[in-house]
Amino acid sequence: KTGQKTTKVLYPQLEVDDHDNPAFLALADGNILAMYTWHGGKPGKWGVIQNVTSQPGDVTSFSDARVFTPRTDELVKKFVRESYTYANPFSLSAENGRIFCFGRWIGYKPNLIISDDQGKTWSEPRVVVTSPNLDVNNRPYVKYYSDGTSKIHMIFTDGHPRVEPTNSVYYCYYEKGAFWRADGSKICTVEELPFHPRDASVVYRATPETGKAWIFDIVTDKGRPVVAYTRYPTDTLHHYYYAIYDKGAWSHHKIIESGRWFPQTQPNTVEREVNYSGGLTFDPTNPEVLYISHQINNRFEISRVEKKKGGKDWKITPVTRNSQYDNVRPFVPRYRTDGQKNILLWMENRRYIHYTDYDSSIRYQYIK
């Protein structure tokens, strides 16, 4: 309303690493819960970090940071590896505001903890998805989306596309104490966790010919899950895809060939993150609209793409063009309420060599 910006340092002891960004959850009383982690961490500097405001809407009222390690000796013994990366909290009104927080913790796998007191205390962790034969170097990547009422939708991969030559995409959702496939059949209850990727719904089965995949976003369109992901026929060919589950099957639509990775590979070096695409995200209020980052004249630019009738073609509208710097990782915040403006955010990279070596700004633009 005023154009003024207010800032608050939540925790001053993180490493320089772009994985260490927070997720925010609006609590039932209007306060905001922030949760985040180091990138893996090490004893003494690892675990999940959280802050909560004491005055709704006032970021200056964030509490001091609380650091905790969601672990049990039994779980660590069974799944061997202990590290803490990512924190993704969601609240379900149908379960009296119960909070579910997911992250990559014990076993290097997606874990789940639950709170029934707005984040003051948490349950013991459970591993959600694991490899059929435990591999502590295998790490499924997950994206989440919740309706805020009863469901938490998940898309995930076998692992990292740098490691998995046929990295595929899977889907499931949580509801009423259990995890379910897209067709509504049950995978398992929370108490029966973990399950394997093959137990969930297959969104995209990768082959050497069609290319391994990585995931970028998930929302719902009239209750149907819609997914944004990338296929890599080769590491220098990044193809953006849209998929929707409708009438019992997944329908896939190619959006664009987006270019290659965005890290600025230095001379006489081998790129470490060849699957770092510019990125794409849904406008969750209109899932037929996405915002993408793609290469134009060797610069990464942001565009708005809208699915045309029939779903096979896309209308592309520029957001940035002729930029001095690369523009990557667009994102439209979820859960906008009536009267709130819709905002597109993205990273502007003056330099991005690696996720530990970058000089970036977060830019934003109001969108319809």
Regions found by a protein language model. Name each.
Residues 1-368:
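Extracellular, repeat-based ectodomains that mediate carbohydrate processing or recognition
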